[in-house]
Each structure stands twice: as C-alpha cells, then as structure tokens.
From Swiss-Prot:
NCBIfam families cross-referenced by the UniProt entry: PRK00364.1-1 (NF001526), PRK00364.1-2 (NF001527), PRK00364.2-2 (NF001531), PRK00364.2-4 (NF001533)
GO cellular component terms attached to this protein's record: cytoplasm
SMART domains in the record: Cpn10
Protein name, UniProt field: Co-chaperonin GroES
SUPFAM superfamilies: GroES-like
Alphabetical list of Pfam families matching this protein: Cpn10
Purpose: Together with the chaperonin GroEL, plays an essential role in assisting protein folding. The GroEL-GroES system forms a nano-cage that allows encapsulation of the non-native substrate proteins and provides a physical environment optimized to promote and accelerate protein folding. GroES binds to the apical surface of the GroEL ring, thereby capping the opening of the GroEL channel.
Highest taxon above the source species: Bacteria
Cell compartment(s), UniProt: Cytoplasm
Assigned protein family: Belongs to the GroES chaperonin family.
Keywords assigned: Chaperone, Cytoplasm
Assembly and interaction partners: Heptamer of 7 subunits arranged in a ring. Interacts with the chaperonin GroEL.
C-alpha cells in the first residue's frame, strides 16, 4: 500500500536511533526517547494560500529532517511499518550533507 498525503502534509519514516548511551548503557525500549529525525517518504501537493494559489513544499522525498518531540502525532501503519504524517510546518530543519 502506498500513502499519498494531501495538501501540506508530509509522510516521514522515523530514523532508527542507538539504544545505547554515550557511556555504553543499553536502554530498554520503554526508556529510550523516540528519535526526532527521519526521512521524507512522500509529500503532498502543497499549501493552499488565502488567494487560492498552491505553494509547493520546501521538503522533497529523500530529505533527512528534524522535527519536534511532539510533532507527527498521527502515526499510520503501512506494510508493517509505522510512518508519521505531519504538516510541513512541524518540520524544524532539513539535514544537509
């Protein structure tokens, strides 16, 4: 199944984070914070402005992004994988390089 977001929505695959602290302590799944980074896997057509025009999104498929800890509260399971659906304005930055 393929997920196609509408308007200014973005679908993100959360990055896998190390479950080990810098000191080498392994964290159980419940103690580890969910990562706030991911890869954009789908984007909507754009934001509809007040004048009716559509502004294209600033992110594209394949971008590595950073988002806030409470962003992407809409989680959807697609083919056994949890994906986040969030508005573009919930993305804080694109990781370059």
């Amino acid at each position: 199944m393929k997920l196609r977001p509408l308007h200014d929505r973005v679908v993100i695959r959360r990055s896998e984070e190390e479950s080990k602290t810098a000191g080498g302590i392994v964290l159980p799944g419940s103690a580890a914070e969910k990562p706030n980074r991911g890869e954009v896997v789908a984007v909507g057509t754009g934001r509809i402005l007040d004048n009716g025009e559509v502004r294209a999104l600033a992110v594209k498929v394949g971008d590595k992004v950073v988002f806030g800890p409470y962003s992407g509260s809409n989680t959807v399971k697609v083919d056994g994988e949890d994906l986040l659906v969030m508005a573009e304005n919930e993305i804080l930055a694109v990781i370059e390089g």
